[in-house]
């Protein structure tokens, strides 16, 4: 952390001693700067809000954000890093099932979870989806592949026109790192992601058919050409930038075909579960429809869950429950073989 003055530094360090293992954010402060509103969180809790008086050093809890969560039942999210095949340092997070650590975790079933965006990042903190998977016995690896934000301009620009190529290699290299460490059972690895992560799931199944025993694609892109043609109106001002960062549908057509999973379904050998919202404004439902149709024509096992009342990710509680129950059943079936 960087502080503007010694008083702020002393105050924050005093507060931090009361919350070992938690991140602390200041969400409000009075004009005299002696009364602060704090928000805490960790990898195992959404934390709480507190009011702190720096004059008499008193702390009062205002409210727990998620009082129903038992932190003792949650898993730790461990910061990790590995090297890509071309020498980039890739940071990420490994969440192990309860009771495991880096020393005793051996031959576990694994879910590789690339984030969406792709120009976003995974961060340390409570993630209910990751905790759900860890609770079901899976080790979960999240990685900030090239293009992820927060690592500088050079790392960001290293992703330009690298969808399905070096960006995908970063994900593959993370999977191989887990295998080499002995943490992953190489016969029980699935890949799951949403949006760009769904695209990375499909490309992972295409490029590494022997590495992944199953895949879950959640609102992912399958065809770079139709994806570009169906972007929402509010993205149209960015289309030229998309051509520069992802690829121009005319000038880079050969490359875009190479990295469009729908054209390489014949390379997929493992079962796939696809979930999609029919009213998705960002990734049109046709992206998933095309993929399912192509897989069925090739005789590749695929399950499809499409919801008419959903967009880019499920928001309705009943649909979310259905999706996670279906994914749990699918992973349990495919990774227990």
Describe every region a protein language model picked out:
Residues 110, 132-144, 303:
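A fold-wide structural signal in alpha/beta-hydrolase
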Residues 82, 108, 138, 212, ...:
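Conserved hydrophobic/aromatic "anchor" residues
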Residues 143-337:
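Active-site-proximal cap/loop segments of hydrolase catalytic domains
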Residues 114-116, 276:
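The conserved beta1-alpha1 loop
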Residues 62, 80-82, 114, 143, ...:
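Hydrophobic residues at beta-strand termini and immediately following loops
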